[in-house]
Amino acid sequence: MSTTVKSRQRVIEHGEVLTPQHIVNAMLDLVEPETERIDSRFLEPACGTGNFLIAILERKLRVVEARYRKSQIEYERYAVLAVSSLYGIDILADNVEECRHRLFQAFDAAYTRLFGKKAKAQCREAVRFILRRNIIHGDALSLKTVTDPPQPILFSEWSLVNGSLLKRRDFAFHELVSHSAMRELPLFSDQGEEVFIPEPVKDYPPVHFLEVAHAYDD
């Protein structure tokens, strides 16, 4: 049985309580269609060791497998997209590392089971790189990284374009959650109304999804 705390001291200092798996699943069942949409994005602002994100990834990967298991390149493309749709922030460095590791293991277990020795190192490297970008050591309250000095949290948006090309755009977290911007304009509108569209702080040219680990300076 999984524990809900790592240590009493961590609860006192950081309010850390881990969500039990049965509660995670019950909560995700409330938004089941979104958890099964491969490109639907999720952010966990206090991700801990990744219980929510892993459960979402496992659901997405089941969809990817059902649709694309007969084609390795198609499976790889959409499995990478599924991983790239998940974001997390945690104030504790060991949680961040464990969350990245567990997400990678969830991906790799499914990938290896399907393709065995045909699994590509490039695909694994792409997933590791994306997880380093998407799971951030930071403070969701201050909207900054836990570094010296702190820096604004940046998130990378990943989108498939023209088949196997992956487009990256970086956004400042504080812009995405700006109360003034959110009050002035909604994020989405089905009535053709003007909406709030955040501006990226950096826009990158598309690259093949298997090349992302070596396509950027970071």
Predicted stretch roles:
Residues 2-218:
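SAM-dependent methyltransferase catalytic region
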